[in-house]
Amino acid sequence: MNTELKILMAGVDEVGRGPLAGAVVTAAVILKKPIDGLTDSKKLSPKQRNLLAIRIKEEALAFAYGRAEVEEIDQLNIHHATLLAMRRAVEALPIQPDNVVVDGAFTPQLNIPCKAIVQGDSLIPEISAASILAKVLRDEEMVALDKIYPGYGFAEHKGYATPVHKEALMRLGPCKIHRRSYSPVADLISK
């Protein structure tokens, strides 16, 4: 009889701190076993991310998403909104982990032990998996929002401050999903 207890660790990461538009999206993942190919989502091609996201969803013991909407980002600031989204992801897990590891330097307020790990998305498989799930979901959302708010190019730049996006902002003005507290959006509104 195996009396060894498995410690359940959830990895958490965010996507979308820097863009001028859209929500910040987080994921929390508890892995059953290692999955080959996991690394920081930014180091993977879209095709690799999509394939790994399917495997993570199939093979993980549990996963969940959290988010903070544009209004929350503008009201709280991106730092606090990100921590809120991380907490929401952990609380949405169908299984409570024994501890949580988060990519970055700060941890959300949780009732379970939590540790921040700088560059954790490259070092800890659970955080890598969370990074991939969050990135795939947010990218899909921005492609869908591109159809609702045409002309900004959200499907291509995902809301980041590219020259194309800045030019569209100047031409069209901000839409509902633009972060009013972010420059150059705030600069446009104040003119």
UniProtKB/Swiss-Prot annotation:
Kindly state one GO CC term assigned in the UniProt record.
Answer: ribonuclease H2 complex
Q: What is this protein called?
A: Ribonuclease HII
| Pfam family, any one | RNase_HII
Q: How is the cofactor bound?
A: Manganese or magnesium. Binds 1 divalent metal ion per monomer in the absence of substrate. May bind a second metal ion after substrate binding.
Tell me the Gene3D superfamilies matching this sequence.
Answer: Ribonuclease H-like superfamily/Ribonuclease H
Q: Which cofactor does it need?
A: Mn(2+); Mg(2+)
PROSITE patterns with a match to the protein in the record = RNASE_H_2
- One MF term in the entry's GO annotations: RNA-DNA hybrid ribonuclease activity
One of its GO biological process terms is:
DNA replication, removal of RNA primer
Start and end residues of each RNase H type-2 domain: 7-191
Annotated transmembrane regions: none
- Protein purpose: Endonuclease that specifically degrades the RNA of RNA-DNA hybrids.
Any idea of its EC number?
3.1.26.4
Q: Where in the cell does this protein reside?
A: Cytoplasm
Q: Give the residues the record marks as binding a divalent metal cation.
A: 13-14, 103
What PANTHER family does the record point to?
RIBONUCLEASE H2 SUBUNIT A (PTHR10954), RIBONUCLEASE HII (PTHR10954:SF18)
UniProt family annotation: Belongs to the RNase HII family.
- Which organism is this protein's natural source? Legionella pneumophila (strain Paris)
**Record's catalysed reaction(s):** Endonucleolytic cleavage to 5'-phosphomonoester
Keywords, sorted A to Z: Cytoplasm, Endonuclease, Hydrolase, Manganese, Metal-binding, Nuclease
